Swiss-Prot record:
Monomer and homodimer. Part of the essential Sec protein translocation apparatus which comprises SecA, SecYEG and auxiliary proteins SecDF. Other proteins may also be involved. It is a peripheral membrane protein. The keyword ATP-binding applies. Belongs to the SecA family. This is Protein translocase subunit SecA. The gene is secA. The keyword Repeat does not apply. One of its GO terms (cellular component) is cytosol. Its main location: membrane. Part of the Sec protein translocase complex. Interacts with the SecYEG preprotein conducting channel. Has a central role in coupling the hydrolysis of ATP to the transfer of proteins into and across the cell membrane, serving as an ATP-driven molecular motor driving the stepwise translocation of polypeptide chains across the membrane. It is found in: Cell inner membrane; Cytoplasm. It comes from Pseudothermotoga lettingae (strain ATCC BAA-301 / DSM 14385 / NBRC 107922 / TMO) (Thermotoga lettingae).
Length: 864
């Protein structure tokens, strides 16, 4: 409940400001120490049992050490940001306010607990850059720093020249000269000897060693995939992560919100043939938009009409399209139609070297190796006429929401979080604290200019750029797709304006290009937020020209993404300006609000090429964005609710695996035998009438000599149960003695393989259930409750199936080769790949169409 006139942000800032004053008072003591004394104190702090009682001293020490080793002195507002992160909250700090430095204090503090801490960022480049940049500070204070990158590459930060470093310690060198009094240390004023002595580099190490380091830098994807891979291993020692204690998520809005609809998936090839996808691609082309189906761009779904259903049945030669036996046909048809009408070349993906490569919708980067799951990627390949690769089968999956919820303490930092504070609170229980800027923000944010057509809009953008280029003012133009960035580039070339294009096709140089975007006369086109995390410093004389000008060519679905673009200008009190150029043909306005604006333009008799501009119109656009944000929030919440159900089951399966990996095979076998027997007693011996024939048939999965109930008499269910359990356990013990020591080792690999195969099959079934339960909303049933009931029933079936297979197979083993068993168990993991999933929620219209088919069975059953 919000209390009127109560500003919690102000209250928190006041609280943290008091702690900052204490830190500053403690700092004097540390600033008088020599380098060696400071190092010794840091070592002493590692021995204390509760660092929380020494937080002011620890932060003061890190502040002094940063000045000496990095030539950077954290401001008071940066100390506030560090305290916010240390309390497990989100610090909103504007671009250029030094978030990288802010993170060092809470990272060092929490690393003192000895459990390992993680700094999570959005790409490999930033992980390496920030670890190297802050590395001298951590190494000076006795911390090991690791970096994890894609393709299994891992590094440790080490001193470049150990001898020079040791001399710098004994000679008490500092990068920041004692007589330098300004708050920023200029490059020219740094002590060159100290700079050279405190240089670091990366050396390659194993993945496991990177996690053993006190502080580990890496991307959200790599941390998540390492967790999933750890739960596919066949030896406990092959696990690389050592737990989830404390993490700071850099660009937290990008990772926990923008990418929250994108589950991490480890998948492998399926048996579905390429010809199936080509067939459905051909059928999709015979279907007419708005007659056979409608396209809902808001929820990215295709809805078949009654005519479309009839036409599909004729084309597929089936009586009832929605009969359960035709589920896969519906699945393929909808995917083929989505590929044709919802996924656009050079916007959602590009075709390179006969391959479909996904474009990240938030950063504009290419994602080679990533594939849409559920057959969608293959449908796009069939549409584009490139070789169709096998459909992927899910081996392991987790959403970022549930991965990051595993951390005992989670914090985040970004320049834009306030607009999403409700979502952070509801989904992650994370509070947003807005940190004041070190210097006042003086950037001018102009009202939007709205044109009738995109052609008029782009012409106006080019004219604006030409005028600013003539006077030397740098311009950064933000676009929403590769296609649009290349269109603008062509127009600027015709106008004779030299410029740089920064998008998915050139991302290797993006940090270098974006860093130069503030130089005099620079014109840069950037796809969305490519180059995020890199500061744009103004060149000489640029401040007098008005600073960096940001031009947005389209409003994003989220106000936050627009604010990120604006935030590239006006860093640390620099001048700057921003403006968005829009048109009624832009996706956001076309889908959600063009009609109202069209009426306004007609009333005002706006001529072709003329824009309308008014603060009320800018607010109207923001209102449209709020509506879209609400829709997207609901989708993310729905995804999280579904994955939370899965999370309980995933934890249960992974706990089973860990139990078996740690050598508890015989204990697991005991449990499996008991479960195997109890289920049969419940089914065949419940009550006064026993179905002994049914029981005998169900026991036929065991070798004949294991158990016989023909000559036995039982007075109760308990007696029967005890007899069966004892008989099977005796057979297990005989088999152990017969085969010897290798038997349990062999069983370990066998059990893990059985668990993994069934879990993989279960995840595939859950994908179908997600679609199926949504059909039931018209039976006055809540899809979420139905999803829980359905998945719990399937999960219980899976556990029963696992135990039955284990119990029956373990007693049929004749000869054992545990090494061969391990190789066989691991063989399926060699072709695994990382998948970017397009998460689909069937909307009401589609469910209504499906519900018309009377032949749909009440229970959605997946063939096994």
């Amino acid at each position: 409940m919000k209390i009127p006139f109560f500003d919690r942000n102000k209250m928190l800032l006041k609280k943290y400001s008091k702690i900052v004053e204490k830190i500053k008072r403690r700092e004097e003591r540390f600033s008088k120490m020599s380098n060696q004394e400071l190092i010794n104190v840091a070592l002493e702090f590692r021995k204390i049992s509760d660092p929380q009682n020494h937080i002011e001293d620890i932060f003061a020490m890190v502040r002094v050490a940063a000045k000496r080793t990095l030539g950077m002195y954290p401001f008071d507002v940066q100390l506030i940001g560090a305290l916010v992160l240390n309390d497990g909250k989100i610090a909103e700090m504007k671009t250029g306010e030094g978030k990288t430095l802010v993170a060092t204090m809470p990272l060092f503090f929490n690393a003192l607990f000895g459990k390992g801490v993680h700094l999570v960022t959005v790409n490999d480049y930033l992980a390496r850059r920030d670890a190297l940049w802050m590395g001298p500070l951590y190494l000076f204070l006795g911390m090991r720093v690791g970096v994890i990158n894609q393709l299994g590459k891992s590094y440790e930060v080490v001193w470049k020249n150990q001898e020079l470093y040791e001399k710098a310690i004994s000679d008490n060198l500092s990068i920041w000269p004692e007589d330098y009094k300004n708050e920023f240390l200029k490059e020219s004023a740094k002590d060159r000897k100290a700079v050279e002595a405190f240089e670091v580099e990366l050396i390659e190490i194993t993945r496991k060693e990177a996690y053993v380091c006190d502080i580990t830098y890496g991307t959200n994807n790599e941390f998540g995939f390492d967790y999933l891979r750890d739960n596919l291993v066949f030896q406990f020692d092959d696990k690389v992560q050592r737990g989830h204690f404390y993490a700071i998520v850099d660009e937290v809005d990008s990772i926990l919100i923008d990418e929250a609809r994108t589950p991490l998936i480890i998948s492998g090839p399926s048996r579905e043939g390429a010809s199936v996808y080509r067939r459905f691609a051909s059928i999709a082309k015979k279907m007419s938009k708005d007659i056979d189906f409608t396209v809902d761009e808001k929820s990215r779904t295709i809805i078949l009409t009654d005519k479309g259903i009839e036409k599909s049945e004729k084309l597929l030669q089936v009586d009832n399209l929605y009969d359960p036996s035709n589920v896969s046909s519906v699945y393929h048809l909808l995917n083929a139609l989505k590929a044709l009408h919802l996924f656009k070349k050079d916007v959602d993906y590009v075709v390179m070297n006969q391959e479909v490569v996904i474009v990240d919708e938030f950063t504009g980067r290419l994602l080679p190796g990533r594939r849409y799951s559920g057959g969608l990627h293959q449908a796009i390949e069939a549409k584009e006429g490139v070789p169709v690769k096998e459909e992927s089968v899910t081996y392991a999956t987790i959403t970022f929401q549930n991965y990051f919820k595993m951390y005992e303490k989670l914090a985040g930092m970004t320049g834009t979080a306030k607009t999403e504070e409700e979502e952070f609170k509801q989904l992650y229980d994370l509070e947003v604290v807005v940190i004041p800027t070190h210097k006042p923000m003086i950037r001018k944010d102009h009202d939007d200019l709205i044109y009738r057509t995109q052609a008029e809009k782009y012409t106006a953008v080019v004219n604006d750029v030409v005028e600013r280029y003539k006077k030397g003012q740098p311009v950064l133009i933000g676009t929403t797709s590769i296609e649009k960035s290349e269109l603008l580039s062509t127009m600027l070339k015709k106008a004779g304006i030299p410029h740089q294009v920064l998008n998915a096709k050139y991302h290797e140089k993006e940090a270098e290009i974006i860093a130069q975007a503030g130089q005099k006369g620079a014109v840069t086109i950037a796809t969305n937020m490519a180059g995020r995390g890199t500061d744009i410093k103004l060149g000489e004389g640029v401040a007098d020209l008005g600073g960096l000008c940001i031009i947005g060519t389209e409003r994003h679905e989220s106000r936050r993404i627009d604010n990120q673009l604006r935030g590239r200008s006006g860093r640390q009190g620099d001048p700057g300006e921003s403006r968005f150029y829009l048109s009624l043909e832009d996706d956001l306005l076309r889908i959600f609000g063009a009609d109202q604006l069209e009426k306004v333009m007609n009333v005002l008799k706006i001529k072709p090429g003329e824009p309308i501009e008014h603060p009320l119109l800018t607010k109207l656009v923001e209102t449209v964005q709020k509506r879209v944000e609400g829709i997207n929030f609901s989708i993310r919440k729905h995804l999280m609710e579904m994955d939370t159900v899965l999370d309980v089951q995933r934890n249960s399966i992974y706990s089973y695996r860990d139990w078996i990996l740690s050598g508890k095979v015989s204990q697991y076998i005991d449990e499996a035998i008991e479960d195997f027997v109890e289920r049969r007693i419940e089914e065949f011996c419940d009550g006064s009438e026993w179905n002994l024939e049914g029981l005998k048939n169900s026991l036929s999965v065991l070798p004949k000599d294991v158990v016989s109930i023909d000559s036995q008499k039982f007075d109760s269910e308990g007696q029967m149960k005890d007899f069966l359990i004892r008989s099977i356990k005796d057979a297990y013990e005989r088999k152990r003695q017969e085969i010897g020591d290798e038997y349990d080792q062999f069983l370990k690999f066998l059990i893990l393989r059985i668990i993994d195969d069934n879990w993989r099959q279960y995840l595939e079934e859950v994908d179908h259930v997600k679609e199926a339960v949504n059909l039931r909303v018209y039976g006055q049933r809540d899809p979420m409750i139905e999803f829980k009931k359905e998945t719990f029933a399937l999960f219980d079936e899976m556990i029963a199936r696992i135990n039955e297979i284990v119990v029956s197979w373990m007693l049929r083993v004749v000869k054992v080769d545990s090494k061969k068993a391990e190789q066989e168990a691991k063989s399926g993991l060699s072709n695994l790949q990382l998948v970017h999933e397009e998460f689909n929620i069937v909307n009401r219209s589609e469910r209504r169409k499906l519900h018309k088919n009377e032949k749909i069975k009440k229970r959605f059953k997946v063939k096994r």
